[in-house]
Amino acid sequence: MNSTHHHGMHTSLHFWNRSTYGLHSNASEPLGKGYSEGGCYEQLFVSPEVFVTLGVISLLENILVIVAIAKNKNLHSPMYFFICSLAVADMLVSVSNGSETIVITLLNSTDTDAQSFTVNIDNVIDSVICSSLLASICSLLSIAVDRYFTIFYALQYHNIMTVKRVGIIISCIWAVCTVSGVLFIIYSDSSAVIICLITVFFTMLALMASLYVHMFLMARLHIKRIAVLPGTGTIRQGANMKGAITLTILIGVFVVCWAPFFLHLIFYISCPQNPYCVCFMSHFNLYLILIMCNSIIDPLIYALRSQELRKTFKEIICCYPLGGLCDLSSRY
């Protein structure tokens, strides 16, 4: 992270900071006509309280998801274990962004001697954010593969996706993503790191898209074939497709919330001096808000799509001071 910071500017990741602050370091250069000093080149300011508030909301929501999956044995299935991994990643991304707001505020208000320590703390947070981003993508891909197996390898599914194997997969995901996140921050001065991250993002999306095209095309054929059979197969197939649709919604929200940020990185690499690119990059803080909103929206999707999860949420909430409210609602 750069040692010079623009007041009030919130950033994420070491090289993301460089891309944002780069807008100001070259502010004296003519980047285009018709742009005033207070115009599109100024970073959109978002109050630090907004980041902290979103971080707290995400923390509470995703902890609720993790506790619910751990508490309810009916949710001890590969898909929900991968959802739990995704919830951890979402929580870390959002909480780290909120924490980095505090760190940057301290960095702007402390003396030079204390800044080096604050920068080191900020780099650690950046590593957590980067690792969590990669873990989010890998968890989504794992859920996609799991749904693929449930639909096309239903008879062998329980032999393929054992609890032990799922645990190994999740452990490997976090180990690889943690190492990659640390390396990305260490070598963040190189543009190749940004290109690598962009490539990973679009490669994973392409893999998930290819799985889904095949999944939904073949699933339609399977549904037609089993339509003449007794209802159990149809019910099971319908449940599997519901899980696939849930993941489709999760991926859609992920793309919508993260795409502006990755477009920001692409513009930083390809056209850092173009007036239109600079104008887009000046809204960097808004893209961070979208990323944090993704971490808040995901638990709502889980709850809306899973009756079992909603039931467990209610049981957990009723164990605490809201128990009286839950008892009242259950009577009506």
From Swiss-Prot:
Cytoplasmic compartment residues: 70-81, 146-165, 216-248, 305-332
Membrane-related topology note: Multi-pass membrane protein
Regions that span the bilayer: 44-69, 82-106, 124-145, 166-186, 192-215, 249-271, 281-304
Binding site for Ca(2+): 100, 122, 126
Residues in the Extracellular compartment per record: 1-43, 107-123, 187-191, 272-280
Short name of one Pfam family: 7tm_1
Disulfide bonds listed in the record: 40-279, 271-277
GO cellular component, one term: cytoplasm
GO MF annotation list: melanocyte-stimulating hormone receptor activity; neuropeptide binding; ubiquitin protein ligase binding
Subcellular localization, as worded in the UniProt entry: Cell membrane
GO biological process terms, semicolon-separated: adenylate cyclase-activating G protein-coupled receptor signaling pathway; feeding behavior; insulin secretion; positive regulation of bone resorption; regulation of eating behavior; regulation of metabolic process; response to food; response to insulin
Keywords of the record: Calcium, Cell membrane, Disulfide bond, G-protein coupled receptor, Glycoprotein, Lipoprotein, Membrane, Metal-binding, Palmitate, Receptor, Transducer, Transmembrane, Transmembrane helix
Database matches in PROSITE patterns: G_PROTEIN_RECEP_F1_1, G_PROTEIN_RECEP_F1_2
Gene3D superfamilies reported in the protein's UniProt record: Rhodopsin 7-helix transmembrane proteins (1.20.1070.10)
Signal sequence region: none
Covalently attached lipid (S-palmitoyl cysteine), positions: 318
InterPro entries according to UniProt: GPCR_Rhodpsn, GPCR_Rhodpsn_7TM, MC3-5R, Mcort_rcpt_4, Melcrt_ACTH_rcpt
Coiled coil feature spans: none
Residues modified by glycosylation: 2, 17, 26
Subunit comment: Homodimer; disulfide-linked, also forms higher order oligomers. Interacts with GNAS. Interacts with ATRNL1. Interacts with MGRN1; this interaction competes with GNAS-binding and thus inhibits agonist-induced cAMP production. Interacts with MRAP and MRAP2; these associated factors increase ligand-sensitivity and generation of cAMP.
Family listed: Belongs to the G-protein coupled receptor 1 family.
Function as written in the Swiss-Prot or TrEMBL entry: Hormone receptor that acts as a key component of the leptin-melanocortin pathway at the intersection of homeostatic maintenance of energetic state. Plays a role in regulating food intake: activation by a stimulating hormone such as anorexigenic alpha-melanocyte stimulating hormone (alpha-MSH) inhibits appetite, whereas binding to a natural antagonist like Agouti-related protein/AGRP promotes appetite. G-protein-coupled receptor that activates conventional Galphas signaling leading to induction of anorexogenic signaling in the hypothalamus to result in negative energy balance.
Protein name: Melanocortin receptor 4
Chain's gene name: MC4R
